[in-house]
């Protein structure tokens, strides 16, 4: 389809920019935007962090995290000494329809990176996203789990980037850091592509698909601000964060039900007890 030129919108310290866009049928466009937060008075040569989410349309925790990061920065924007680029939705069609992949194509957005400027629509969009993120000092790729698994806040890194990324991962206020073998990592993911293009990238995972878990989200937001303080992006004292468990390959287990069925409490559930209070 036709490619549209970037458009930039300004609102106080927030600059909303079109990263990449493609024409769709019936006079519509697929548009990926980013919010850039910065204090222009600090100059151009500033540390930069990119926060990316919305790769899968059924993962909503990242939406809350992006909102909360923007809200806190706007509340005390005089403390912002660097550049914060927020990509809240890199799979707009998936988020609009609540589907994990890209509708119509049944394609996982996290399997087309680094993309191709001359490729099909998904590959073209992926290439535009990668090109825009390159130059960041750090990227955080935020995911939720699927609808069948509830995961505690965690940071995932592979073993060939462990030396560079583990210090950052420990600052993220996650409950554990999962270091896994690079052999099991698909090279078409956003994180793999960025790490191999020179942008240190952390993957965070938490919660359940199609839901928002505010407690987990707030923990990760605190971790992001702690990380930004250490990077010189946020002028404030680093936050106290969890000391995560460091897990390597073979040390992580998923607890799953052996039988299908319906869970019934024989006594009031913790939620009902809390409501009665």
Which sequence ranges carry the predicted segments?
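Single conserved hydrophobic/aromatic residue that forms the stacking wall/gate
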Residues: 1-7, 265-277
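Short glycine- and acidic-rich boundary segments immediately preceding or forming the N-terminal edge
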Residues: 5-35
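Short beta-strand-to-loop junctions in surface cap/lid or active-site-entrance loops
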Residues: 34-45
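Active-site/substrate-binding loop(s) of hydrolase catalytic cores
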Residues: 45-46, 60-61, 65-189, 193-206, ...
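Conserved phosphate/anionic-ligand binding catalytic regions in large, soluble enzymes, centered on
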Residues: 56
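Active-site-adjacent mobile loop/cap segments within catalytic or ligand-binding domains
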Residues: 188-237, 251
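Generic structural motif
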Residues: 232-267, 271
